[in-house]
Amino acid sequence: MLNGLRTQPWLYRKFRSAPNLAMTEEQFRGEAVELASVLMTNQYSASNAEIFSEGYRRMKIGPIVGEATGGNVLTVSGFISLWDGGGIQIPFIGVVTPEGEYLEGKGRRVDVDVRFDPNAWNEGRDNQLEAAVRELMKRIK
């Protein structure tokens, strides 16, 4: 979805086996509908959700509300079973910004930090969603 909004590379993937090879996210150079939007994230937003969050922020599409993402962005190989029932996966592709910063281990920050409130949730309210709606309403003309 982000690729329809941007014509310059905003993220690269680097292979462990070929450190000098960098692959950009696919780029679509069509037209995009520009509407007000807000992105919600939390510490459970991982993998492509973190990539989407990074692109959303870099492209200045709108504010990001909630909590920083977890920082889990590596591409891994197949699952290798262990004798005790566990297993391992080997990371082989890292996701890198144009400035060379790896996303792995560094949660994507938010513009409006709103911690989940379990008491509000028990009352039938979602304080993070409420904050996101407030931010969106500021942008609707």
Stretches with model-predicted labels:
Residues 25-26, 58, 72, 138-141:
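Bimodal feature
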Residues 33-36, 60-63, 139:
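Loop/turn elements at helix/coil->beta-strand transitions in domains of secreted/extracellular proteins
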Residues 1-40, 44, 73-82, 92-96, ...:
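Gly/Ser/Thr-rich loop/hinge elements
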Residues 37, 45-60:
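Cysteine-centered nucleophilic/redox motifs
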Residues 59-73:
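Short, well-structured beta-strand/strand-turn elements
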Residues 1-7, 13-16, 48-54, 67-68, ...:
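Intrinsically disordered, Ser/Thr/Pro/Gly-rich linkers and terminal tails that flank
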